[in-house]
Amino acid sequence: SLDLAEKALERAETYGAGVMAKNDPDFPERLLQIPACPAVLYVLGDLSAARRPCVALVGTRSMSEYGRKAAESLGRGLGASGITVVSGMAKGIDTVSHKSCVEAGGKTIAVQGCGICNTYPPENRELKEIIAANGAVVSEFAPDAASQSSYFPIRNRIISGLSLGVCVVEAAARSGTSITANFALEQGRDVFAVPADVFRSTSKGTFRPLRQG
């Protein structure tokens, strides 16, 4: 209802976030091209970073040392090249990707699986502030919505939708990362994967997008 929408807007603004509808001229153009484009995005920071070339770096929360180094190298390389890094601010690969991009002077965008006024995981509150100061944190969910397991697969279409391509850094066979890669393929985005240890369980999801072409 209109009353609920006004309350949501008020809550977001109190938190310091803005609201961008898909008919807004500044709404990310690439996102408009995808099926099930979000009607609104709550934005903390500056979403103009989405106008640059964007690449999503995604992967497991339970990363290996190899995965960490790969995410760090990619995040730094993309950030230093003026390419915006998009990820989900989860533990592991996402966190390293965001941090390393910012450390290289780059812009980054985090797509949350909860409302903009919440932070998941909670220990990434400081990272959230850093991302908002060097890009944007976005969410399509109501501002106070708590994280739910069903929200993460839904938001993954936005991670791939904002991006020209998705790079799977390290992932298990059945994972949210695989969902993001599948969305990317459906959206006509390029999908890349970091070569990994074929014997590691956290690499099985890395090879899946390669097999799917």
Predicted regions mapped to residue ranges:
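Helix-hairpin-helix
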Residues: S1-K7
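Glycine-biased, small-residue-rich flexible motifs in mid-sequence functional cores and linkers
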Residues: K7-T14, G18-G213
